[in-house]
Structure formats: C-alpha cells, structure tokens
C-alpha cells in the first residue's frame, strides 16, 4: 500500500490560515488521504492539519515585540527543524511570515526537503538583495501578482504566478444596495468610505488629514455621508478621539465591519495604502490614496523603495490610475479636490481598467497553488 502524501505546512497569522485552508482543500480533491502537519490556525485545523504549536506563537509584529519573543521563536524553529528532518514530508510549504518561514525553509532545504514559499515578500519594492536569500531557501515561490513573477524571472529564481485569492473571492460585480442595507446606510444619498488604516501608527498619521478633508467636503456637499471602517475597538477609540478634536460637528457613521462591505456600500473611497487598495480595485469603486509615515521611515522609504507607485492598483497597471498623496502631499486640500472629482465624474476609464485587472489576477489561486506544489513533488 502506497504511503499517503505528507505535506509540512506553516501559517503565521490569520490571513495565512485562510490561504492554508484553501490550499489543503485543493490538494485533498486530488489526494483525499494527504496528511498536513506543522502550524495552522482554526481553519487549517478544521481541514485536518495537525498543528504542533499554537499559531499565536508566530503572530508577532514590530521590532520590539519580535525581540522580546526571540528566544521562544528560535526554540520553536529548532524543534520544527528537528521534527521535519526526523519525519521528512514530501514537501514543505511556508505561508507568508517570511522572517520565520524563510529561515526554517533554508534549514529544511539544506536537509534535502523540497520547500515552497507561498506569498512573495515585497522584494520587488525594497531590499531587492533578499531575492538571493529566497533562492537559497526555496525550490519554488508562489506569487499573487504577475509583476512579482517577472521580477523573479529576471533573477532566474523559480516562481509561479497563481493569481490572487482576493480576486477569486470578490465577484466581478459588487452590489451597492445590499451592502448599504447591511450597514444601515440610507440608500438615497452619496457615501464616501473613509479607511484610515488598520494599524495604530496609520490612524495616528491619517485620522486628522482624512477628517479635515471630510470637513471641506461637507461644506461643498452637505448631503454627503461619511462611513468609516475600523478593525477593532482600539482603532475606533483612536478615531473617535481625533473626530472630537478636529471636527466634532461632523457626522461619521463608524462601522466595526470589514472594509469590503464599507467599500461596496460607497460611491467613492479615501484610503490608506495597503491591501485595501487592491480590494477597492476589485470592488470597482473609485478611490484616492493618502499615506503618511514618520520622518525617519519616510527617509528610509525614499532611499529603499524601488517602485514608482505605492498602491497595488498603480503598480499592477504600471500607471497612475489612482491618485496617491504621500507625506507632505497628503493634505486636506489635495484629498478634497480629488474626492470631489471622483464624486462628480463617472470614472469610466478607471473602473474599466479595474475590471480588466480583476480578470488578470483571477485564476483560482487555491487550485493553482495546489497544482504547482504537486508538480514540484512529482519532479
């Protein structure tokens, strides 16, 4: 009797748990008895993945936090190396969490285990020399976006473009009215979605310019509604504080809901750069990007960033489809002028291009990831 396929797999945070779940399902369609072991969250565990450690162990952000947890992280890594070298899987798949996974993948690859890194780190954008570390640690990288594969190809590093799971999850057309009902927003007025980011540092920098932009918009369009998506109670309190300070007279509808519903319900979107810009593109809503970071980070970014643009829709199109106001340009006046333009125009060229790009990256990523990994095992 043939022994079942064994796949080592590690996800370091919730987004990785979702990717792992889809990947496991797709592999099991072809190999129902396949075994998965490593570190996963609730979704992967529900698919039958055996988790050797709690995923929370890896979900640390920020330099100070990581340093505090370093001894524990090193111990977990050492135990995983020992486990996988004593019980070698047919392949190891590290999902995202590059700081942890790439180091582990390097050790496993040196021990003769095939390794895959799922979700390319942003090497194309900054610290491009990391590509040599990635090459040393992996047999294959799975990339969400076509320009990522083009970058790896330039360095002859094996990479497969699998499409983006968000492009699979979001329908080609998204209905505004049901989203408004869901959020309790009036149907007969225009709404601007205000998305000041999900991290404390982002809200600290962006709440004030975004709120002051809304102040200017309210003077010009008294009937315009403002709906704000906030990821948790901490971010809500942070935004409320800024609201009280800068524009207590304005009426913001605060929503503890995903950005996706808030974007879908809106007529235009003012957002912090990040994955949310890609989501907004896939939902076909006109947007403007505003972003500020502290002076030191800005200084580093200027020297290190290798891309013309910061938002994914522009990087993907290699064109300024979406206005980006960064640092000193991220002012209420600039944002106000662009939001006004978006509200008064039909934005057809922008939205048509969004639809075209949705098709580019909609490839059934779960299935593509499974195919690429299984092909590597069979090599």
UniProtKB/Swiss-Prot annotation:
GO cellular component, one term: membrane
A matching Pfam family: LpxB
A biological-process GO annotation: lipid A biosynthetic process
Catalyzed reactions: a lipid X + a UDP-2-N,3-O-bis[(3R)-3-hydroxyacyl]-alpha-D-glucosamine = a lipid A disaccharide + UDP + H(+)
Enzyme Commission number(s) of this protein: 2.4.1.182
Keywords from the named record: Glycosyltransferase, Lipid A biosynthesis, Lipid biosynthesis, Lipid metabolism, Transferase
Pathway: Bacterial outer membrane biogenesis; LPS lipid A biosynthesis
EC top class, as a word: transferase
Function: Condensation of UDP-2,3-diacylglucosamine and 2,3-diacylglucosamine-1-phosphate to form lipid A disaccharide, a precursor of lipid A, a phosphorylated glycolipid that anchors the lipopolysaccharide to the outer membrane of the cell.
Family as reported in the entry's similarity comment: Belongs to the LpxB family.
Protein name listed in UniProt: Lipid-A-disaccharide synthase
Organism: Vibrio parahaemolyticus serotype O3:K6 (strain RIMD 2210633)
Lineage: Bacteria, Pseudomonadati, Pseudomonadota, Gammaproteobacteria, Vibrionales
Name of the gene this protein is made from: lpxB
